[in-house]
Amino acid sequence: MFNDTPQMVSETDVVVIGGGPAGATASTLIAQKGYKVELFEREKFPRFHIGESMIPETYWVLERLNMLPKMRASKFVHKHSVQFVSANGRQSAPFYFYDNKPHECSQTWQVVRSEFDLMMLNNAREHGVNAHEGVRVLDVLFDGERATGVRIQEPDGQ
């Protein structure tokens, strides 16, 4: 990987750009397979983000990431159903997850993204991911068709 002054920073197998849930998930799963992963996130966590409502199917991914014990120990609100309300106030009947799929996964969480995203990023670190916060990826460097590194901007602007 390279910074603005094309100087080699490190050898790695995989670079992941973005440390939100998708980036943290991808980097953790790759690291679990034994690859050396560098993750770059332009923001410093925790940071505000929209999108708090999880669905039951996230259980299986959280299980693969070894996140279930952390989620169970968290103070996030447990979610057992959904109900929809239209703009005119009309409400649907509640949809209880357990009625559709009687399994432990039928309970999920309503998360605070700033806290959840930090938990996910720290979990990636626990699995060996070298996560860099406050670092912007400016460009992906190629040698022909092969990506060979990234050009980054450090928090101090370098």
Label each residue range with its predicted role:
Residues 6-20, 38:
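Beta1/beta-strand and adjacent pyrophosphate-binding region of the FAD-binding site
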Residues 10, 77-80, 133, 146:
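Short, basic and Ser/Thr-rich N-terminal targeting/leader segments
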Residues 15, 31-50:
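Glycine-rich FAD pyrophosphate-binding loop
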Residues 23-24:
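N-terminal Rossmann-fold NAD(P) dinucleotide-binding loop
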Residues 34, 66, 128:
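Short glycine-rich hinge loops at helix-strand junctions in the catalytic core
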Residues 47-89:
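N-terminal FAD cofactor-binding segment of flavoenzymes
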Residues 86-158:
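Conserved N-terminal helical subregion
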